[in-house]
Amino acid sequence: MIFAFGGCALFASSFYSVQRTCQTRLFAPKIAAFCFWGWQLVILLAAISLPLGYTSSKEYAELEWPIDILITIVWVAYAVVFFGTIMQRKTKHIYVGNWFFGGFIITVAILHIVNNLELPVSFTKSYSLYAGATDAMVQWWYGHNAVGFFLTAGFLGMMYYFVPKQAERPVYSYRLSIVHFWALITLYIWAGPHHLHYTALPDWAQSLGMVMSLILLAPSWGGMINGMMTLSGAWHKLRTDPILRFLVLSLAFYGMSTFEGPMMAIKTVNALSHYTDWTIGHVHAGALGWVCLLYTSDAADE
């Protein structure tokens, strides 16, 4: 769901929108083609290796070291194409959607490399360089931000292109979208410890994760409101435009998920919610409600 569906959606939508917002063709089309085939190979190898039991056992980072290296190569190629296209743009301004795509590309690269530092013992087995509470902290720094940047920042870049396009209205507040970007980039990276409440992780780190999660509610809802209010003067289109309905519904799920996340990060709430189906429902609201509804709407748009 995350890397096959979500990954392909992000490659496609970022390559599509960056050309139109920069008024230029893709930089290095052959490298872009390599990104496509390389990512399909990653998905194929994952589909083969995981059922056979070849796994690092890390959530969201289960793939073994040879596939990790392939992901790194493909991701560097992705960055070259995307940022190369921005460098050759015909417009002076870099559209806010491209800021979100760019932030997602850079941050996911850092997360992937740091969390997957491993000592290979064979072609199909490796051991993490981290251990104990440190390993848990690095893993959930990665795990939380894989969701935060892969499924949030990247798809917000998608939202900031397709919602105004489908509504035929400018972004409600461009200034708010810039504040949204920098606040999200600054705060999201610190919230990972809320996955490790009541564990061996130092209490100060757990509390820091909780506080950052609560602060994160403001930029998250700022972005959701900005997307919704972009329909100002175009609400009547919801009667006849099914694509716009799905886009609005995806924003509603984004708002709901980003309210649940900070609430569940509160230690007293987490004591009740952890290890329950509420956590699973929270993740599914984001992945199936926000991500799937947004991208299927975008695909239908084109």
Name the predicted role of every residue range.
Residues 24-39, 95-101, 170-183, 239-248:
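Membrane-interfacial loop-to-transmembrane alpha-helix junctions, especially the N-terminal start
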Residues 43-58, 81, 106-135, 158-163, ...:
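C-terminal ends of transmembrane alpha-helices
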Residues 1, 61-69, 133-148, 207-213, ...:
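Short aromatic-rich membrane-water interface segments that cap or initiate transmembrane helices
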Residues 139-192:
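Short helix-boundary/re-entrant hairpin motifs in multi-pass inner-membrane proteins
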Residues 17-24, 83-92, 159-169, 226-236:
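Cytoplasmic membrane-interface regions of multi-pass membrane proteins
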